[in-house]
Design a protein with these regions (language model features):
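Conserved amphipathic alpha-helical segments that form helical-bundle/coiled-coil interaction surfaces
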Residues: 50-132, 142-148, 160-168
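Short linear motifs at protein or domain termini
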Residues: 1-56
Length: 168
């Protein structure tokens, strides 16, 4: 019953039990079960899908925030940027956490109440992504990118911020 509830099995009367296509029948709980099985992290294909989902969620949030931000929203975003700059001096782990908070902050400040919860659901995956991103890109480039995001959002250039997000 538990495997059926998680979307791994189909149970049909008179036909019995068959293996289900969990991508079609599963839920967020299914994904968490798969990640737990793999030590809390997704395989490469699933990680790519999660990253793609992030683009789908954060890009529109950037556009929305750029279109309707208040001075308080910009102050909050700039504070998150400063926290990232300070965290960069502490090392990769601290910067990864700050980058996560900055990007989750964008979704929150956009007015969406669900997207930040989805970001929280994938905190561990996000932190691993950010650590790898920092190592590949470098701290200075990460901070430069944050400054660009903040500037585009403040200028009302949501499409530019969203495009920058996709560029990495």
């Amino acid at each position: 019953r538990e495997l059926h509830r998680l979307g791994f099995l189909d149970i049909a009367s008179r036909r019995g039990v068959t293996v289900a296509d969990y991508a079609q029948t599963g839920s967020l709980e299914t994904l968490r079960a798969i990640m737990d099985f793999h030590g809390g992290l997704p395989d490469a294909k699933t990680a790519g899908s999660i990253l793609q989902l992030r683009y789908y969620l954060e890009g529109p949030a950037m556009e929305e925030l750029a279109a309707r931000h208040t001075p308080a929203d910009m102050a909050a975003l700039q504070a998150l940027q400063r926290q990232a700059e300070q965290a960069a001096q502490e090392g990769t782990d601290a910067l990864a956490e700050a980058l996560f908070r900055y990007h989750r902050g964008i979704t929150f400040l956009s007015g969406n109440t669900i997207t930040p919860l989805l970001f929280n659901a994938f905190t561990r995956v996000n932190l691993e992504f950010w650590k790898e991103y920092i190592q590949l890109t470098g701290i200075d480039r990460c901070l430069e990118r944050l400054a660009q995001f903040t500037a585009h959002i403040e200028a009302g250039e949501g499409q530019a911020a969203s495009s920058l997000l996709r560029q990495g």
